[in-house]
């Protein structure tokens, strides 16, 4: 069984597995990792950062039609995105509570939406 997503390293590895156009960037400081598209002018597909010591948060773009679904499914662990457009972005709090499949679905969706430039 695959370990739960709880680290920036795990998120980076998964994001980079989605396509060879994804790279890590640290636009603010070493805490804020941006996963960016090379071929889309550096558009961000996800921000990953420690918000509290030992607590990794990940901002992802989501389809607006599914926003409420995710907020209701994980009301304590998925929130309107920190420092982002709350209509289009969600924050996942990665403490092992969110199923791996759901973390991967949200990251894949963000990859597709940001690759298209939506």
Q: Which stretches of residues belong to each language-model region?
A:
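Charge-dense, helix-prone N-terminal extensions
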Residues: 1-118
